[in-house]
């Protein structure tokens, strides 16, 4: 939370152009974060699928024994 509060306070003393720059960077950062979240979700899903497959393989091995 502190990170978001700081730029807001800084904006008060900045010129208009600088303010616009800050808002642009923050929105691009938000986009970046969202993309990363999406990637992480995908990876998590892949990991889940892999663990399920592993479990199935283990079961099959047990059945053979």
Swiss-Prot record:
Full protein name? Protein C'
Q: What else is known?
A: The P gene has two overlapping open reading frames. One encodes the P protein and the other the C'/C proteins.
Q: What does this protein do?
A: Seems to stimulates transcription by the viral polymerase. May play a role in viral pathogenesis or transmission by insects vectors.
Q: Which domain of life is it from?
A: Viruses
Q: Which family does it belong to?
A: Belongs to the rhabdoviruses C protein family.
């Amino acid at each position: 939370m502190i990170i978001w509060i700081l730029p807001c306070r800084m904006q008060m003393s900045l010129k208009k152009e600088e303010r616009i720059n800050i808002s642009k960077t923050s929105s691009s950062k938000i986009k970046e974060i969202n993309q990363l979240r999406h990637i992480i979700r995908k990876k998590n899903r892949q990991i889940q699928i892999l663990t399920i497959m592993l479990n199935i393989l283990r079961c099959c091995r047990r059945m053979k024994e």
